């Protein structure tokens, strides 16, 4: 789980010169379907186990974990290269972490919808003006008496 590093021998009374860093990177993922508020979805490496994930969250982030469920998601096999050979995306593991009693998590809204601003009304005015000009160009000339424009004189 940790990198292969040679640490100096620990002597009684001496400082501990170690910093724990993992080789694992986990991604917090917005769930595709609605889940309970106490369930969080992660994308984790294939080598990582449930116990590793529980220790990772409790040890590094101090997040109390009640249960961890995992599944393997197979990568898609639909893309093809220039030789018409299938290209398979790598498999990954999805972990569903159920938080301890009373803990909830809501995924943050990273891209909120923008409100109507005064600039939007100026754009609407410009659009309506251009639309009126287009209608005026397409309307027939009353002096032609119903003769189509393609029938020129």
From Swiss-Prot:
Q: Where is this region: Disordered?
A: 108-153
Can you list the GO cellular component terms from the UniProt entry?
Answer: fibrillar center; mitochondrial inner membrane; mitochondrial large ribosomal subunit; mitochondrion
Oligomer status and interactors: Component of the mitochondrial large ribosomal subunit (mt-LSU). Mature mammalian 55S mitochondrial ribosomes consist of a small (28S) and a large (39S) subunit. The 28S small subunit contains a 12S ribosomal RNA (12S mt-rRNA) and 30 different proteins. The 39S large subunit contains a 16S rRNA (16S mt-rRNA), a copy of mitochondrial valine transfer RNA (mt-tRNA(Val)), which plays an integral structural role, and 52 different proteins.
Q: Which Pfam families match?
A: Ribosomal_L23
Which SUPFAM superfamilies has this protein been placed in?
A: Ribosomal proteins S24e, L23 and L15e (SSF54189)
One molecular function GO term is: RNA binding
Q: Where is the composition biased (Basic and acidic residues)?
A: 131-144
Q: Name the Gene3D superfamilies for this protein.
A: 3.30.70.330
Note whether Ribonucleoprotein occurs among the keywords. Answer: yes
For this UniProt entry, what is the primary localization, expressed as one broad class?
mitochondrion
Which GO terms fall under biological process for this protein?
A: mitochondrial translation; translation
Give the similarity note: Belongs to the universal ribosomal protein uL23 family.
Which UniProt key words apply to this protein? Mitochondrion, Ribonucleoprotein, Ribosomal protein
Recorded protein name is: Large ribosomal subunit protein uL23m
- Write down the InterPro entries for this protein, in alphabetical order: Nucleotide-bd_a/b_plait_sf, Ribosomal_uL23-like, Ribosomal_uL23/eL15/eS24_sf
Q: Where in or outside the cell is it found? A: Mitochondrion
Q: What is the lineage of its organism?
A: Eukaryota, Metazoa, Chordata, Craniata, Vertebrata
Q: Does the keyword Lipid biosynthesis apply?
A: no
Gene, per the UniProt record? MRPL23
